[in-house]
Amino acid sequence: MSVVAIMIHVADVEAGLLWYQRAFPSAKRKSIAEPFFEYLDLDGTSIEIVLADEKVASGAAGSVAYWYVANFASALQHMQSIGATLYRGPAEIEDGKRMCQVRDPWGNCIGLRG
């Protein structure tokens, strides 16, 4: 098994797509014609930016996906430079690696690990 998609709930889908494209510069914007839907493809994992609603609001409320980063300090600095705020950590983990969580402009958590 592997993760194929991460759904991120935001108040403004277009703003969310633009922000996450900046957060993950190697992600490619793709679309489906019927029904029309845009998403980001990051090495085969879909980052699906969808409208928050009464069932699922944006913000920190549960599971967090952690992205492997080759240079932890650089990745954290990049996220903060585009408006993410540090939420938890950084913490030292096994094998000399570090991990943290940052929050996007809608309050959703993004985990970094490397």
Identify the residue ranges that each predicted region occupies.
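Core segments of cupin and vicinal oxygen chelate
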Residues: 1-2, 7-47
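Vicinal oxygen chelate
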Residues: 3-11, 30, 39-41, 56-114
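A short alpha-helix capping/helix-coil boundary motif
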Residues: 15-17, 53-57, 78, 111
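Short secondary-structure boundary/capping segments
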Residues: 29-30, 38-39, 55-58, 92
